[in-house]
Amino acid sequence: MHLNMLKSKIHRATVVQADLNYVGSITIDRNLMDKANILEYEKVEIANINNGARFETYVIAGEAGSGIICLNGAAARCAQAGDKVIIMCYCSLTPEEASEHRPKVVFVNDDNSISNVTEYEKHGTIG
C-alpha cells in the first residue's frame, strides 16, 4: 500500500500574470521551485485563496529571482493577477516512509520572495 502525502508547498504566493493564450501549465520562479523541491513538468495542485478554486496542472520553470507565478492556458481562467494561491505537490510513500516524512513548506512575501522554509506543518504553529 502507498499513501499520497504532501511533498511540498509554496504558501500564499501572489499570481503575477495569467496568460490564457499560452499552451498550459504554471510558470514558477526557479528559486521557489528549488526551495520547495518541485521539478519542472511535475504535477501540482493549486488552491486559489481568493475564490476557493482548486485545479491541477504541471510546472514550468521561470527565471530565478523574478518572483514569477504565471497561470497559463486554461489554468488562467482559475485565477487573476493579484490572487493568492497555495501550490501543492504530493508524493507516494509506504506507511513506513510516511511515518517519518515531513513536507517542505515555503512561505513567501507579497513579492514572492522567500520569507521562511519549514519541514513540518501543524495547525497554529507556523506562518
Swiss-Prot record:
Keywords: Autocatalytic cleavage, Cytoplasm, Decarboxylase, Lyase, Pantothenate biosynthesis, Pyruvate, Schiff base, Zymogen
Binding positions (substrate): 57, 73-75
Gene3D superfamilies named in the record: 2.40.40.20
Cofactors: pyruvate
GO biological process, one term: alanine biosynthetic process
Catalysed conversion reaction: L-aspartate + H(+) = beta-alanine + CO2
Compartment(s) of residence: Cytoplasm
GO MF term (any one): aspartate 1-decarboxylase activity
Positions of the catalytic residues: 25, 58
Cellular component per GO, a single term: cytosol
PTM comment, free text: Is synthesized initially as an inactive proenzyme, which is activated by self-cleavage at a specific serine bond to produce a beta-subunit with a hydroxyl group at its C-terminus and an alpha-subunit with a pyruvoyl group at its N-terminus.
Record EC number: 4.1.1.11
EC class name: lyase
Modified positions (Pyruvic acid (Ser)) in chain numbering: 25
Protein's job: Catalyzes the pyruvoyl-dependent decarboxylation of aspartate to produce beta-alanine.
Subunit: Heterooctamer of four alpha and four beta subunits.
Family: Belongs to the PanD family.
Annotated protein name in UniProt: Aspartate 1-decarboxylase
Organism the protein comes from: Clostridium acetobutylicum (strain ATCC 824 / DSM 792 / JCM 1419 / IAM 19013 / LMG 5710 / NBRC 13948 / NRRL B-527 / VKM B-1787 / 2291 / W)
